[in-house]
């Protein structure tokens, strides 16, 4: 089977969507599934206003339709709700082709953080976008419950995976900062709510890994925080394992891949009780969640690091691929036996 992934998020972006697509595509090979991608990289692009790191494709519905037809794929999966996703959806509906979608990003909250756009308007549009397909993949039960309450239908379970061979506790070393070390990894952007972490009165050191549009501003505002910028994957694994607690201040993520990377490294996680953290560590195993983020961060210092590692072991890319293919097969009305 050949599947076309249509995504407005792609390299050189470094984010959870791109990482998930890369790992899912690689894992699907063992299911005898070949994936192709339609991304902004083959078009002229325009930076997204207020977020220049994201490039939007400048093209037409007719060209997108021709490109999809030329790929001769068995199924179209729409990953994002940007220009390419919108045009691919239009093509599928006009051609009478079944398609599936993913709900990766809480765009209504992202938009309202930057522009005076009511969240209700954005959710209404997203509901119509996703409900017109044959299935929408969501990574957590709490997200599914929230979207269902907003009128989304055809929601299908998904998950995320983590490379537990790469992210592991034995990579722990001395980072050279006073302990305990509180770490945060991710895009340095307004929707990630980093000041909620950086404003906390915590002992030891705060360390932030990642790039983004807010980096210069936050560096100036928080001179005592260690901002390390982007780090290669090998070095990132060492940093994860060397922290004493991982703090996840975002309230708008739909999962939080960095959470399970930290857990796989044996580092307990502190977060708000919101979608993603509540699903992964809401039972107190592997971390702590609280509306008082400082309380959660301090509590995480006392969480068993072996338990954190064990919690990460339940997340695999094979399970993610199996859930993905089940949704695709439902959309196509097939019951193919997947390769082992």
Protein language model regions, located:
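Short hydrophobic beta-strand element within catalytic cores of glycosyltransferases
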Residues: 264, 268-271
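Donor nucleotide-sugar binding/catalytic pocket of nucleotide-sugar-dependent glycosyltransferases
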Residues: 124-170
């Amino acid at each position: 089977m050949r599947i076309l992934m249509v995504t407005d998020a792609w390299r050189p972006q470094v984010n959870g969507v791109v990482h998930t697509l890369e790992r899912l595509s690689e894992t699907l090979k063992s299911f005898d599934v070949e994936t192709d991608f339609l991304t902004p990289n083959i078009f002229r692009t325009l930076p997204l206003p207020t977020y220049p790191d994201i490039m939007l494709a400048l093209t037409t519905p007719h060209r997108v339709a021709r490109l999809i037809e030329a790929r001769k794929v068995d199924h179209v999966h729409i990953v994002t709700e940007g220009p390419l996703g919108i045009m691919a959806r239009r093509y599928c509906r006009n051609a009478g082709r079944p398609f599936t979608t993913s709900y990766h990003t809480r765009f209504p909250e992202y938009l309202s953080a930057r522009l005076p756009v009511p969240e209700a308007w954005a959710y209404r549009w997203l509901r119509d976008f996703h409900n017109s397909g044959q299935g929408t993949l969501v990574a957590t039960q709490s997200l599914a419950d929230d979207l269902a309450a907003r009128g989304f239908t055809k929601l299908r379970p998904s998950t995320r995976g983590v490379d537990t061979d790469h992210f592991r506790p034995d990579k722990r070393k001395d980072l050279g900062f006073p302990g305990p070390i509180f770490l945060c990894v991710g895009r340095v952007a307004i929707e990630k709510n980093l000041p909620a972490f950086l404003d906390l009165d915590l002992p030891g050191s705060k360390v932030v890994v990642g790039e983004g549009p807010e980096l210069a501003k936050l560096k100036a505002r928080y001179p005592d925080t260690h901002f390390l910028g982007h780090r290669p994957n090998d070095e990132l694994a060492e940093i994860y394992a060397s922290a004493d607690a991982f703090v996840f201040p975002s309230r708008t993520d739909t999962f939080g891949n960095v959470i399970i990377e930290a857990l796989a490294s044996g580092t307990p996680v502190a977060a708000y009780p919101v979608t993603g953290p509540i699903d992964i560590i809401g039972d107190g195993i592997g971390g702590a969640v609280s509306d008082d983020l400082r309380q959660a961060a301090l509590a995480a210092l006392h969480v068993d690091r072996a338990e954190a590692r064990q919690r990460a072991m339940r997340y695999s890319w094979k399970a993610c691929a199996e859930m993905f293919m089940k949704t695709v097969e439902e959309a196509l009305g097939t019951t193919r036996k997947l390769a082992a």
